[in-house]
Amino acid sequence: MIEKLFKQNLQKFVPYTVPKLDYEIKLDANESFLKLDDYMMGKILNKIKDVEFNRYPDAGAEKVCRAYSKYVGINRENIMAGNGSDELIQIIIAALVDKNENIMTVEPDFSMYGNYSEIGGGKALIFQLDEEFNLDVDKLIESANVEKVKVLFLSNPNNPTGKVLKREQIFKILNGCDCAVVIDEAYVEFHEESIVDSIYEYENLIVLRTCSKAMASAAIRLGFLITNSFMLNEIKKAKPPFNVSSVTQAIGEAVLEETEYIKKSLENIKNERSFLIDKLSAFKEIKLYPTCANFILIKFKDAEFVYKYLLENKIVVRNYKQGRLKDFLRITVGSREENEAVINNLSKILK
């Protein structure tokens, strides 16, 4: 009887799980391979000493939002912190999408846009990218308007392809679509061309950012939503109180203050990306897709075989197994040692 209590639309979902795999090199989640150094850890510990663990967090996450405001060059009143971008996506949907209303995203893209919408009672419509994973902007606009979409979600750079939309393309979408447009810039630091400065010009633009990738802080689950003041005040109505822990706020503030450290880390990751692309390009039987992120999407003749071979050699990468990406693997850019391990193992099974 108890199963009748649950939403019908939950029946097609399975709980998100991370498989327990035996590996030594982890290149499946687009994390930074750089651990925070001793100086950064010391600064973080000093910040945490001031946390009042008996008190609820600052509900507005004021200090970390001010730090992010300085980092991104956007007014503080246009920024809201969240418990990772995932929570911010859920808040956007809760604020804007009623039951049976539509959101739209593209395929391939981050799957949780659609999942969170459908869990909340909305409908997720999928617009297909072409064979080379390019977006037909005109057809997207037409489809979004015909379907009366409430929110359009696009990651830029795209996850998992690594491709980017140019600012002019995004402007065209913003001008043409009768809906809120969420540009998820989780990987923007690896590309450096952001749309965030346009929030003052476009009333339907929402930008998402994260500390998980470029700032090597995935463990703390800290994201930011950036939009115009009216949009933000309305979205805040759907935000849970005290949603970002005091520890997360303290660590985020410490990391964001060290802009030179972040810059040097990005240079390191970009250098390793160039190294990995150069070495992978020598294999003639695979297809690399140009990337502006910290990962590389690769098409193999037998992706499942390559995935299992790498895993047998203690290297885990992202295996999609089905759908449009069943012949693809996504490999996170790792350290030089990790990247060389990938190349050395692939050289034993590829030409």
UniProtKB/Swiss-Prot annotation:
Q: Which reaction does it catalyse?
A: L-histidinol phosphate + 2-oxoglutarate = 3-(imidazol-4-yl)-2-oxopropyl phosphate + L-glutamate
Which residues are modified to N6-(pyridoxal phosphate)lysine? 213
**Enzyme Commission number(s):** 2.6.1.9
What processes in GO biological process is this protein linked to? Answer: L-histidine biosynthetic process
Signal sequence span is none
Q: Which InterPro entries match?
A: Aminotransferase_I/II_large, HisP_aminotrans, PyrdxlP-dep_Trfase, PyrdxlP-dep_Trfase_major, PyrdxlP-dep_Trfase_small
* Transmembrane segments annotated in the record for this chain: none
What cofactors does the UniProt entry give for this protein?
Answer: pyridoxal 5'-phosphate
Q: Which UniProt keywords apply?
A: Amino-acid biosynthesis, Aminotransferase, Histidine biosynthesis, Pyridoxal phosphate, Transferase
Q: Known Pfam families for this protein?
A: Aminotran_1_2
Group of enzyme by EC: transferase
| Keyword S-adenosyl-L-methionine annotated | no
- Give GO terms: molecular function aspect only: histidinol-phosphate transaminase activity; pyridoxal phosphate binding
The record's NCBIfam families line, in alphabetical order, gives: hisC
**Family note:** Belongs to the class-II pyridoxal-phosphate-dependent aminotransferase family. Histidinol-phosphate aminotransferase subfamily.
Q: How does it assemble?
A: Homodimer.
The protein here is known as Histidinol-phosphate aminotransferase
Question: To which species is this protein native?
Answer: Clostridium kluyveri (strain ATCC 8527 / DSM 555 / NBRC 12016 / NCIMB 10680 / K1)
Q: Which gene encodes it?
A: hisC
